[in-house]
Amino acid sequence: DPKPLKANAGKSFQGSIVLGMGFTFDDSGEADDDTPGIPSPIATMERLIAENPRNADVIFPYIGGKEVNDSPTHAHHRYVINFGDRSEEECRSGWPGLMAIVERKVKPGRMAQNREIRSRYWWRHGEICPALYSAVAADESALAVAQTSKYKAFTFLGKDFVYDQKLIVFPGGICSSFAVMQSTPHLEWAEFQGSSMKDDPVYTPSLCFDPYSFPTAFLDPKTTNPTHESALQSLEDIGKLYHEFRAELMVSNNEGLTS
């Protein structure tokens, strides 16, 4: 079996395992202010921010694979409370209104979790992924792909999202990265190496990304080798052209990546 390559370590991440839809604000389906396990209305979020602007510090746009694949502009429609790794005391004193929501709508489900750490820290996401968000913070955007989809289509997303667990995220999103990841060799490799869910292939980083042998120029973006510089620039130009054309086509046809 292919082995993970050191050059690829720490360059791909699964998004956050929020573990509780009660953390979210979403008007696209069932939502209310009381029922555990479902979102709150966005109007509730807006009211809480108006009452205490500091609440905006821990509410983030939330995006998953469906929005990335279905929206022509990868538009999100959800928001999520994210206290990071803050203590319960800090969250209660700093954001009492939001903590009340999480206690009412998330805690009951989390207390039933078999993993003790998830019930003990019920006000935090199930997996907060600090390495992912630290890596993304250094760049303007990140490359992402829906983990489970018949067609693998990579795209750029802003860095201010909370990424759902159904997204695989690659910090340092540049057009040369996009060109390599969207290329036929990589897509065929991922389909062959990856796992599956029902009839859809699953992009599993440990199987699809970590063992993949990327072009030398791609691995050394600060190269001073003229041949590698030329190859990297070609990848950058091709990736930019393809991504821009695809983005314009999706908007003009009002179609998503896989619709």
Where are these regions (language model features)?
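S-adenosyl-L-methionine
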Residues: 1-259
